[in-house]
Amino acid sequence: MSRDQGSTEYDANQRQEQHQEQHNTSYTHTDVRTNIPNIPAPFISTGVSGLGQQLVGEGFTASAARISGQSSETHVQMTPEMEAEARKDRERYERELQAINERHQRDIEGKTEAYRKQAEQEAERLRKELEKQHQRDIEFRKSLVQGTIENQKRQVELEAQLAKRELDREARLATQALDQSKMATDVQVNFDSAVGHTVSGATTVSQSEKVTQSKH
């Protein structure tokens, strides 16, 4: 495409965009046409095109390419003000990016600290629960030992009671045996005494008869 054809197409597009059509209403409108001067399209340098691609993407780059293709005579360089503006934009971008990263880091630290505290609280709760369980185990074993001791104590008491009753029975048996032995001894003594008295009486009688016979 030649430069004249490109310029003509550009002028036609500009006229079509700025043309005000007449609407079908009850009012009268006047079409206004403005004569557009034939100004060569500017040429965007590679640096500006690259910055435009970073900021707005491929669309701006394509538009810049179309514009730059229309003229090869006009070159537009970034002014110091534009460079300062771009530098400020870059600095603002760096600050905002740093702020985003710092907020993200603080968020991570906050969540980590909250999780750590929660984990510590849970660990402390588990530790106390384990201590309680250990104390319950001790009390359980103590209860078993005390129960065993009480059981053995009751068994010993029962055996002692049984032994005492056995001793009481043996004592009664011994008493009964002693009483029976004493009664047998008394009978023998009485019997022996009775026999001796009878013999003595007989002798007496015999002597008396002898004495009587002598007197006669």
From Swiss-Prot:
UniProt keyword terms in alphabetical order: Coiled coil, Cytoplasm, Repeat, Stress response
Annotated segments matching region CAHS motif 2: 152-170
Coiled-coil ranges (or none): 81-180
Subcellular locations according to the entry: Cytoplasm
Other comments on record: Trehalose, a disaccharide essential for several organisms to survive drying, is detected at low levels or not at all in some tardigrade species, indicating that tardigrades possess potentially novel mechanisms for surviving desiccation involving tardigrade-specific intrinsically disordered proteins (TDPs).
Region: CAHS motif 1, residue numbers: 115-133
Family from the record: Belongs to the Cytosolic-abundant heat soluble protein (CAHS) family.
Protein name: Cytosolic-abundant heat soluble protein 2
TM region positions: none
Gene coding for it: CAHS2
Function of the protein: CAHS proteins are cytosolic heat soluble proteins that seem to contribute to the anhydrobiosis in tardigrades, but their specific mechanisms are yet to be identified. It is possible that protection during anhydrobiosis might occur via the stabilization of vitrifying small molecules such as sugars, but not via the direct glass transition of CAHS proteins themselves.
Region (Disordered): 1-34, 66-91
Basic and acidic residues bias (residue ranges): 12-22
Biased amino acid composition, Polar residues: 1-11, 25-34, 68-77
Domain-level remarks: CAHS proteins contain 2 repeats of 19-mer peptides designated as CAHS-motifs that comprise each two octapeptides connected by a tripeptide.
Cellular component terms per the entry's GO annotation: cytoplasm
